[in-house]
């Protein structure tokens, strides 16, 4: 499938902005290991489920859950995952970050469940499974596509990241929403 042209309005238009919070859950383990693009997976709530599948952009902030102890859980592929609930994050990681989010079926991987995966456009020293992720979705980049190669998928994800970062950092009508999470 050919990537459609991305047309971004001058400011968020209905149904955006969408402001919500969700716990970070374990996903399939592909974002970091296979693609080199880590994601924070979240359950799909009714608000997100009402959106068309595709790629979205906005702002997010991680909130540690301090009343939870570390625990190990098993991912569907059998790998053990440490849920530290974000309690190991440093102060400089607990700020507002730009994000790009995929909602859909990931046809390249033939998922049987719809997934919401958020790539936070920052580097982190540790994982933060179990933390709460507060985020604001401000717009839509493109529909979900299928790919014939992993390289084509990665290339499109990197394009989504570049487009989203440019919008969030350079368009005042989008940049101003960062303050809602500070």
From Swiss-Prot:
Residues annotated as the enzyme's active site: 117
GO cellular component term of the entry, any: mitochondrion
Top EC class of this enzyme: transferase
Entry superkingdom: Eukaryota
InterPro entries: Riboflavin_kinase, Riboflavin_kinase_bac/euk, Riboflavin_kinase_dom_sf
Residues that hold Mg(2+) according to the record: 39, 41
Cofactor notes: Zinc or magnesium.
Pathway connected to this protein: Cofactor biosynthesis; FMN biosynthesis; FMN from riboflavin (ATP route): step 1/1
GO biological process annotation, one example: FMN biosynthetic process
Enzyme Commission code(s) on record: 2.7.1.26
GO molecular function: ATP binding; metal ion binding; riboflavin kinase activity
Catalytic activity of the protein: riboflavin + ATP = FMN + ADP + H(+)
Reported cofactor(s): Zn(2+); Mg(2+)
Swiss-Prot/TrEMBL keywords: ATP-binding, Flavoprotein, FMN, Kinase, Magnesium, Metal-binding, Nucleotide-binding, Transferase, Zinc
Alphabetized Pfam families for the sequence: Flavokinase (PF01687)
Function statement: Catalyzes the phosphorylation of riboflavin (vitamin B2) to form flavin mononucleotide (FMN) coenzyme.
Family recorded in the similarity comment: Belongs to the flavokinase family.
Name under which the protein is recorded: Riboflavin kinase
Lineage: Eukaryota, Fungi, Dikarya, Ascomycota, Saccharomycotina
